[in-house]
């Protein structure tokens, strides 16, 4: 068996079951393990998460149980500057951002990775459900986690070769149920703790209320394509394309079907609504993306076929990708029209099990017509 005792791995510990088991497995494999809790949000704010203190206590309990040193590091400034400001800027543009993608790129695998290297780390490890494999040429490939329901490569799609080469994902080859079972067998303090949901580091608070602390909401009309006013919206930033909940308008209309958000117009502060889950305005034939990035350094061909997803836990769909000359922009054409393609979200490319990378969706089109700004 390899002697791992000289290899230092710094584990990002959140106080959840996944990162707890990550630390346990590495410790059992003989690595020199250090646990680090990242404090990325000021929870003294009256609307902030009040769970950071509890989470850190859980990290301390687990670290003591498995016998590893642990520390807390404060990345509030980095998080605010690199993730939260971006998040607000996207909402101001009427888009729906994905802060988790940015948080992984800028905090967990940049600020945290840099900090870990200062502690003499050879690798960092997290509880993400993803896998890394190095080929015979030393190129690191990121593969989906085998638990289809938990695979998190969508959120890791902006990571670089340099970041992946220094990263371990011990849970990537496991099902979530196995991870829970390991935690319970080991009697870890977090074994029965429920998974966190909600925005990266902001937790599960009322999102609408939270956002209104930072961005002024401006009410306006909810209008059909024919110009009929159906009601008032609370502020365009609170709505996303394809959304049904929270509109406060029943069936009626021509078809009695539920109403969905089909577009926003920032200039007139109008929210467009249409009836039916399969409303034609919700279907795009292609999208344009920017900030396109691939996990391997080898240049990609300018045109290629692969599969893609443009939201977490969505099944992949077959697409054709055309890259710009410099490779940072892409036109992604779907083999069949796709529903509720949302500007601000990530589009992520796959080749079988491998996550190739991705970009941020700027615009969605139905044939030649731009959608969502009806």
Curated annotation (Swiss-Prot):
**A Pfam family name for this chain?**
tRNA_Me_trans_M
Q: Where in the cell is it found?
A: Cytoplasm
Keywords in alphabetical order, please: ATP-binding, Cytoplasm, Disulfide bond, Nucleotide-binding, RNA-binding, Transferase, tRNA processing, tRNA-binding
Which reactions is this enzyme annotated as catalysing? S-sulfanyl-L-cysteinyl-[protein] + uridine(34) in tRNA + AH2 + ATP = 2-thiouridine(34) in tRNA + L-cysteinyl-[protein] + A + AMP + diphosphate + H(+)
**Catalytic residue positions:** 103, 200
- The ranges of region (Interaction with tRNA) come to 150-152, 311-312
User: InterPro entries, per this entry?
Assistant: MnmA-like, MnmA-like_C, MnmA-like_central, MnmA-like_central_sf, Rossmann-like_a/b/a_fold
Could you tell me the EC number(s) of this protein? Answer: 2.8.1.13
Q: Where does ATP bind?
A: 12-19, 38, 127
Q: Name one GO biological process term.
A: tRNA wobble position uridine thiolation
Which residues does the annotated region (Interaction with target base in tRNA) include? 98-100
Would you identify the family this protein belongs to, as annotated? Belongs to the MnmA/TRMU family.
Q: What is this protein called?
A: tRNA-specific 2-thiouridylase MnmA
Q: Which GO terms describe its cellular component?
A: cytoplasm
Q: Which organism is it from?
A: Enterococcus faecalis (strain ATCC 700802 / V583)
**Which positions does the site annotation Interaction with tRNA cover?**
128, 345
